[in-house]
Amino acid sequence: MNASDLIRIMQFGDSVLPVGAFTFSNGVESAIQTGIVHDVATLKGFVLTALKQAASCDGMGVVAAHRAVVADDRDGIIRADWAVNNRKLNEESRLMATRMGKKLAEMSIHVVEHPLISWWLEQIKNGNTAGTYPVTQAVVMAAQGIGQREVVVMHQYGVAMTILSAAMRLMRVTHFDTQHILFELNHDIEKFCDIAEIGDINQMSSYVPIVDVLAAVHVKAHIRLFSN
């Protein structure tokens, strides 16, 4: 990998990228409120579950969309996007995916200035596609020539950091703890990438009942710091 590709991955994979990720907790807010997550060990387990689920659902969507971009199959990009959106059973998950996806597309047309990204944002605004974050991420990075496995790694990192950053504001956990969790979970990244690179939207699965239960709890929560 050359330095130019690496720095683009770092830029667009940055946890402070202005796409609104800081407003979402990826379910950990309700998990902490209900006591499912209450210490470092349970937080690590929650992140691990989220990464496994992301690999078998959104990650496959990333790969399918990336392959469609490379093949210049714009209908394939849209199919992958709807596949990701339709597998998000709760409204808050769909809101997170589509809001961040649109923000990423809006930002990217000013940064990358690629016709495919302009077309993608137009499809989102016209309602022709949902504009989920995983697929938008694949479109933006594939347009820059970044490989599919690298984009899956970016997506996995984003899932983990969204949860860990939220946990820092919700429970008694230190920066050292969250960085150690992230480092340990990175050992499984190859396995998660292998799952995602199946890339078949017909095999995508979002079956994690606890996530949907926690989402339902979050909707009716009296105090909420995050949007999901």
UniProtKB/Swiss-Prot annotation:
InterPro entries according to UniProt: UreF, UreF_sf
Quaternary state and interactors: UreD, UreF and UreG form a complex that acts as a GTP-hydrolysis-dependent molecular chaperone, activating the urease apoprotein by helping to assemble the nickel containing metallocenter of UreC. The UreE protein probably delivers the nickel.
Signal peptide coordinates: none
MF (Gene Ontology): nickel cation binding
Lineage: superkingdom: Bacteria
Predominant location category: cytoplasm
Alphabetized UniProt keyword annotations: Chaperone, Cytoplasm, Nickel insertion
Family named by the database record: Belongs to the UreF family.
Pfam families named among the record's database cross-references: UreF
Function of the molecule: Required for maturation of urease via the functional incorporation of the urease nickel metallocenter.
Subcellular location: Cytoplasm
Protein name: Urease accessory protein UreF
GO cellular component: cytoplasm
Gene this protein is translated from: ureF
